[in-house]
Amino acid sequence: MTMELQRPREAAALTLSLLDLTNLREDCTPQQIATLCQRAHTEFGNTAAICIWPRFVAQARAAFGKDHTIRIATVVNFPSGDLDVATVVAETEAAIGDGADEIDLVIPYRKFMAGDESAVAEMIAAVRKACAAPVLLKVILETGELKDKALIRRASEIAIAEGADFIKTSTGKVAVNATLEAADIMLQAIRDSKKKVGFKPAGGIGTVEDATLYLRLAETIMAPNWAMPSTFRFGASGVLDDVLNVLAGGEPAKAASGY
């Protein structure tokens, strides 16, 4: 285990640098987005990104201007995964036009669970085509709904094959979100692919201690110091409070506080 993950302050600093600070509440307001943009800049450094609804991307881009130090991530086909390909491509193109740096795409997981792998491949390929470099594509598998280990593995493989830059566990909108079990399967799929693909657990990561468990798992499966903003993100909101508390010298929280 690397030294960073043995010390809470170092683990907190790493978590901060990997954080997609998220507000995907249905009742999110422009004022909350303004606050989110401000919170992404901390006295200890910046988060990797913010993750917001498409309707707020233009506002966030206006706040950040031409500075892409903190990236703007948004969601498409979210959270249901049920939209048609043309609609999702249009969502993606509009979000990029508004200034999004990263697209978090939900796969049509219900079709996938019914045996339709081609629907997943087609959706990812179409959105991948719409995400010209340097826009990143993160593919949300909704592992808490897939449940089955073989399905999670296969969804990971399809996403990687179709050009995902990251594979992400969850929307945060279902009963079961990120789990270490799903993370283990997804990280092994990344390792076995021998491709440069990142991993993003989302939902239920509320403390530095929670985050450290995922970082240790990534280190075990991938390599020491593998986790960096180009390979690993956390989708969370509440964890920032504990990160800042620990970095300020406070005691780490024990209990997760959710998405």
From Swiss-Prot:
Localization of this protein: Cytoplasm
InterPro entries: Aldolase_TIM, DeoC, DeoC/FbaB/LacD_aldolase, DeoC_typeII
EC assignment: 4.1.2.4
GO molecular function: deoxyribose-phosphate aldolase activity
Keyword line: Cytoplasm, Lyase, Schiff base
Reactions this protein catalyses: 2-deoxy-D-ribose 5-phosphate = D-glyceraldehyde 3-phosphate + acetaldehyde
SMART domains attached to this UniProt entry: DeoC
Pathway annotation from the record: Carbohydrate degradation; 2-deoxy-D-ribose 1-phosphate degradation; D-glyceraldehyde 3-phosphate and acetaldehyde from 2-deoxy-alpha-D-ribose 1-phosphate: step 2/2
Stored Pfam families: DeoC (PF01791)
Coiled-coil residue windows: none
Domain of life: Bacteria
Entry's Gene Ontology cellular component terms: cytoplasm
Keyword presence, Ion transport: no
Active site: D104 (proton donor/acceptor), K168 (schiff-base intermediate with acetaldehyde), K200 (proton donor/acceptor)
Predominant place of localization: cytoplasm
A single BP term in Gene Ontology: deoxyribonucleotide catabolic process
Family statement: Belongs to the DeoC/FbaB aldolase family. DeoC type 2 subfamily.
Matching PANTHER family: DEOXYRIBOSE-PHOSPHATE ALDOLASE
Function, in words: Catalyzes a reversible aldol reaction between acetaldehyde and D-glyceraldehyde 3-phosphate to generate 2-deoxy-D-ribose 5-phosphate.
NCBIfam families, per database record: deoC (TIGR00126)
Name of the molecule in the record: Deoxyribose-phosphate aldolase
